[in-house]
């Protein structure tokens, strides 16, 4: 097997691992916000797809219509998770774009 000059696959893999570890730490600190019901239910999700907070406006709390509240929470959380995944994909794309590893393909990053 002939390797091109200047290409050290182990060094490239180590660099990728280091960058990925740093990115995971950074994503834990970055957040997105999402809401449903015109802001009646709001959530904050970090870049690791962890829900950090849920806020529910008192006006939407109706003991006679719990299903509506549940639907709003689900909608807000799903929107927050989607936004978080998009943010994470963009950040990971920055890492992948800076590396030149022939044959390496990571779904969603290239």
Curated annotation (Swiss-Prot):
GO terms for molecular function: DNA binding. Keywords: Cytoplasm, DNA-binding. The keyword Glycoprotein does not apply. SUPFAM superfamilies: YbaB-like. InterPro entries: YbaB-like_sf (IPR036894), YbaB/EbfC (IPR004401). GO terms for cellular component: bacterial nucleoid; cytosol. Its main location: cytoplasm. It is found in: Cytoplasm, Nucleoid. Binds to DNA and alters its conformation. May be involved in regulation of gene expression, nucleoid organization and DNA protection. Belongs to the YbaB/EbfC family. HAMAP family: DNA_YbaB_EbfC. Homodimer. This is Nucleoid-associated protein Sfum_2790.
